[in-house]
Amino acid sequence: AVGIRQASLYYHFPSKTEIFLTLLKSTVAPSTVLAGDLSTLDASPELRLWALVAAEARLLLSTKWNVGRLYQLPIVASDEFEEYHGQRAALTNTFREIATEILGADPRTELPFHITMSAIEMRPNDGTVPSPLSDESLPDTAIMLADAALAVLGAELPADRVNQSLQLIKQADER
């Protein structure tokens, strides 16, 4: 129970599909904005990709419920959610573009996005926040996944990557 009457909910949303679409878009919109901002900052592609993976994993680990699981529901494949699919494709493409700057044309450029999304499988869905958002630190899981994303590309880990990434995330948030 969320404390909202059905009539009130349908006053704002014409259908269950619209409610779900709004929820889906709310999970990908902040990440898409952050990814776009990080991709344009003045930093090496290795640092930008590392920061993007860490930032996205950080977001996936910062909610009470595992909203990333919504992406896996069969209904999401429906054409009714085309707007969401476009946003998610843009996010995926940003990961791929930065990885391509590091590796060139190589199928491994698809992997950093999927490594990041593994945070969904690595966290509980029991109403607890695994890693509250912090401007001072990144969750250990986010660091591990970001390291893995660069390792799979055969890229060097940037020096002082955690502090530099926190600064990049802060810069992106301020834009």
Where are these regions (language model features)?
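Short, structured loop/turn "capping" segments at alpha-beta junctions
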Residues: 63-68, 95
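Helix-turn-helix
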Residues: 1-18, 22
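Short, hydrophobic secondary-structure boundary micro-motifs
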Residues: 67-72, 159-162
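Amphipathic alpha-helical packing segments from all-alpha helical-bundle domains
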Residues: 32, 72, 77-124, 136-143, ...
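Residue-level detector of well-ordered alpha-helical segments, enriched
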Residues: 23, 48-52, 66, 108-112, ...
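Hydrophobic alpha-helical connector segments
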Residues: 22, 26, 36-62, 87-90
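Eukaryote-specific, intrinsically disordered low-complexity regulatory segments in nuclear proteins
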Residues: 165-167
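Amphipathic C-terminal alpha-helical segment
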Residues: 59-62, 112-136, 147-162, 173-174
